[in-house]
A protein has these predicted regions:
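Carbohydrate-interacting/catalytic domains
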Residues: 134-285, 317, 332, 346
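Conserved small/polar residues in nucleotide/adenosyl-binding loops
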Residues: 353-355
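Ser/Thr/Gly/Pro-rich low-complexity, disordered linker/stalk segments of secreted
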Residues: 274-341
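Substrate-binding cleft of secreted/luminal carbohydrate-active enzymes
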Residues: 123-135
Length: 357
């Protein structure tokens, strides 16, 4: 056992949690204690004396509603709010055994891509609830949570990485995070923000990684302050862009995201292409699938812009822009302490809800 998840930690006695932390440290040096906390100042529970991490419900809410409402200001504001609590290793998630599946919550299923790009790149420890990597749906019912906790036959998903764009994206993001230390240890700096586009940097040891997301049905151009290098490469698409006058000019595809890293400065990095990176190919394969089979959640494409066009028209607020390219000294990256090392972990919640694997 490498860790324990404490249910309803916000009602546990603090003296008990302190004693548990001391005991856990004696049993195993890197034993991990995570608590379920719905709201409040997370630093009350996450510190050197009590727990290592708690559930980040604040970001959970912002990730899906910020996309449903085309409001990246909500996500950016939430990140700043959490940063003000201190350098916490929060457990980031988009769904779990108590809430509806992310694929069900999203009004536009194509937003599965930018949501998960943010999950894997914003400060914190990313987690995936079993089954959601396949894009399965689950709606919370009045008297039962059975639909949120189905039994899955893994044989049904044996080739999911090759055929399911949701799974391909999750697999790629996991590899990218593993080979990009700045996503685990780097400081956070907001670079550009509108209702529908969002860009930020993760800086570590002179290396700047840039993350761009777009929740609009049209591609968007962005000009962003880059790091001290000659060229950047998109880790999902493999696309290369030059640094010109200290900036990169990139185009972010509709309803997508990209993680840009300095080319040639990260020898461990191996470019990864996913089905979601090739929008036309995904749409063609989806049409072939739906023409021969009844559409299921795991078969739906995450890049089908047609769904949005057919959806109910919504009122679009005036576009607001904030230039936040300056990096504050307050956002200096943490040292590689034991606490910072927790950020490198990616947690997968198994069918057994009380254990981390």
């Amino acid at each position: 056992v490498d860790g324990i998840r404490l249910d309803a930690a916000d009602v546990l006695d603090f003296d008990f949690m302190r004693a548990l932390r001391r005991t856990a440290a004696e049993v195993k040096e890197d034993f991990w204690l995570m608590g379920e906390v719905i709201h409040g100042d997370y630093s009350r529970w996450v510190n050197g004396e009590t727990l290592h991490s708690v559930t980040n419900y604040a970001l959970h809410k912002a990730l899906y509603s910020g996309h449903n409402d085309h409001n990246y200001f909500e996500i950016a504001h939430t990140v700043k709010y959490l940063q003000n609590m201190g350098n916490l290793d929060l457990y980031n998630f988009v769904d779990n055994h108590d809430v509806e599946r992310i694929y069900t919550k999203l009004s536009n299923k194509a937003h599965f891509a930018p949501v998960h790009v943010l999950l894997y790149t914003l400060p914190g420890v990313p987690s995936i609830y079993y089954g959601s990597e396949f894009g399965i749906e689950g709606k919370k019912e009045k008297f039962s949570d059975d639909s949120l906790r189905p039994a899955l036959d893994i044989k049904d998903y044996a080739d999911a990485v090759q055929k399911n764009p949701c799974t391909a994206l999750i697999a790629a993001l996991g590899k990218i995070r593993q080979h990009t230390p700045a996503l685990s240890y780097g400081s956070y700096a907001e670079l550009q923000l509108t209702n529908r586009q969002f860009a930020f940097a993760r800086d570590l040891d002179g290396i700047r990684v840039i993350v761009t997301v777009n929740n609009d049905d049209n591609a968007a151009d962005m000009s962003l302050p880059a790091g001290n290098c000659a060229e950047y490469i998109g880790t999902l698409t493999g696309r290369k862009v030059p640094v010109q006058d200290g900036r990169i000019n990139v185009t972010v595809a509709a309803n997508s995201g990209e993680i840009w890293v300095p080319a040639g400065e990260m020898p461990e990095y191996i470019p990864v292409k996913t089905e979601t990176a090739d929008i036309e190919k995904v749409q063609e394969e989806t049409e072939e699938t739906t023409s021969t089979q009844t559409e299921s959640p795991a078969q739906k494409t995450i890049t089908a812009a047609e769904e949005t066009a057919a959806a109910k028209a919504e009122d679009i607020q005036p576009e607001k822009t904030a230039d936040t390219s300056a990096i504050s000294a307050e956002n200096s990256f943490p040292e590689n302490t034991e606490a910072a090392a927790e950020k490198e972990k990616t947690v997968i919640v198994a069918v057994s809800y009380t254990h981390l694997r």
